[in-house]
């Protein structure tokens, strides 16, 4: 192969790669998921979880991939509790608000401590289907539940 043919091959491959990249960006914008930005007016689903008698009620939550979701945890007990999200919020954006105290580690949200009569809201958009267990990790509190994310 001579030098001229090699240059044309290199430029041809580069052009094809640029065209594929451009087309993938164009089609991706039409399929965008909701965001957490205040300007995004996508309606959200609200699910209230009561914490009472050392239980999460309801214990099983069902949400959909791509649906903006707000989980509202209300601690009705006279004692402190925690919400440990497991892998539910891994790799996605989320917002935490309310009277709970969020704790973070290198992987993201470790847990939220919920005082008696406290409330914490967690806003997120589920990205992957699956079953995501959550629990309270305080000593002696055997409380757990799960979020089922469906397509």
Segments the model singles out, each with a brief description of its role:
Residues 2-13:
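Bacterial N-terminal signal peptides that target proteins for export
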Residues 13-24:
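Bacterial N-terminal signal peptides
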Residues 29-36, 55, 106-151:
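Extracellular/periplasmic metallocenter environments
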Residues 40-68:
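N-terminal edge beta-strand
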Residues 73-75:
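Asparagine-centered strand-capping/turn motif at beta-strand->loop junctions
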Residues 77-79, 128:
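Short, acidic/polar linear motifs in exposed loop/turn regions
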Residues 82-86:
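Beta-strand signatures of extracellular beta-sandwich domains
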Residues 89-100:
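Short aromatic-acidic-glycine turn motif
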């Amino acid at each position: 192969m001579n030098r001229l043919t090699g240059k044309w091959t290199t430029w041809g491959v580069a052009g094809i790669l640029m065209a594929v990249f451009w087309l993938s960006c164009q089609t991706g914008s039409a399929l965008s998921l909701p965001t957490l930005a205040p300007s995004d007016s996508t309606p959200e689903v609200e699910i209230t979880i009561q914490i009472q008698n050392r239980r999460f009620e309801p214990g099983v939550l069902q949400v959909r991939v791509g649906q903006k979701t707000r989980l509202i945890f209300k601690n009705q007990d006279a004692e402190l509790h925690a919400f440990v999200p497991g892998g539910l919020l891994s790799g996605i954006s989320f917002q935490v608000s309310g009277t709970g105290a969020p704790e973070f580690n290198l992987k993201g949200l470790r847990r939220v401590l919920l005082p008696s009569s406290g409330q914490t809201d967690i806003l997120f958009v589920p990205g992957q289907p699956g079953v995501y267990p959550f629990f309270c990790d305080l000593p002696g509190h055997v409380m757990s539940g799960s979020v089922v994310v469906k397509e």
